[in-house]
Amino acid sequence: MTIKVGINGFGRIGRIVFRAAQKRSDIEIVAINDLLDAEYMAYMLKYDSTHGRFDGTVEVKDGHLIVNGKKIRVTAERDPANLKWDEVGVDVVAEATGIFLTDETARKHITAGAKKVVLTGPSKDNTPMFVKGANFDKYEGQDIVSNASCTTNCLAPLAKVINDNFGIIEGLMTTVHATTATQKTVDGPSHKDWRGGRGASQNIIPSSTGAAKAVGKVLPELNGKLTGMAFRVPTPNVSVVDLTVRLEKAATYEQIKAAVKAAAEGEMKGVLGYTEDDVVSTDFNGEVCTSVFDAKAGIALNDNFVKLVSWYDNETGYSNKVLDLIAHISK
């Protein structure tokens, strides 16, 4: 069965979700809603400064996109309730505007005829969050779910492996995070986050993130045990998590590496990766795993206190897991 998907919001994540869907036989994008006009939408899809040219044909006909010969309905509705998803048979909406992140607001997609909705960001209410490699097995048929954040998608699988094998007493996370669309090219007004208004290409910017606390929502056994912060850095894509934890069960760094490697080659294949190469951030541009453990970068102070490092393409990895969640809730 092919799952018919509508995308609301054609920004960074909306477009990368679209690109990733072209490589899957189980998912078909049938509609896109954004306030951009179709010609500009086609241009934004064709050319990407980070991920290169679109691998396929993109045309515009009668105000709609024709991608690889298939028509995709284009609309420009501000209110999701008016989207008439049922007219094009949409099963699941990828809600990628960053605006409709509660059950109440996202439910407008259901009103408009969609069966289910996946939020491509952490929910702002109690809408359940699901992370592949952490808690997909806890899905119970809810019609609106969240794919959490890109950083939670990196942290949760690694934290689960460490906690399952050695037990986490407590931990702190830092994500060294690539620039995102909310930042400023030069210093500009940012009333809620003064540091966040400083020029993105000129600064390392400390920032808050709910990613570590959100792990406690997808892995309740870690609730209250993790928190963290972010440094925004002047790179266009690919971020890295630094997780420093105290372990219940003593373990050498070699034992930790072995446990992560076993998970990466076993039950978490395709989610958690493992490398012993001398890698840097650009080596992960286009990486579909949401967390790639860097065995050489981590360090242990002793057998109970360790720093672990894991890379993620905050656009590609996350967008691929949005599609995995869409497929999972459509079974």
Curated annotation (Swiss-Prot):
GO terms for biological process: glucose metabolic process; glycolytic process. Pathway: Carbohydrate degradation; glycolysis; pyruvate from D-glyceraldehyde 3-phosphate: step 1/5. It holds the Pfam family Gp_dh_C. It is found in: Cytoplasm. Catalyzes the oxidative phosphorylation of glyceraldehyde 3-phosphate (G3P) to 1,3-bisphosphoglycerate (BPG) using the cofactor NAD. The first reaction step involves the formation of a hemiacetal intermediate between G3P and a cysteine residue, and this hemiacetal intermediate is then oxidized to a thioester, with concomitant reduction of NAD to NADH. The reduced NADH is then exchanged with the second NAD, and the thioester is attacked by a nucleophilic inorganic phosphate to produce BPG. This is Glyceraldehyde-3-phosphate dehydrogenase. Keywords: Cytoplasm, Glycolysis, NAD, Nucleotide-binding, Oxidoreductase. The lineage of its organism: Bacteria, Pseudomonadati, Pseudomonadota, Gammaproteobacteria, Enterobacterales. PROSITE patterns: GAPDH. Homotetramer. The keyword Transport does not apply.
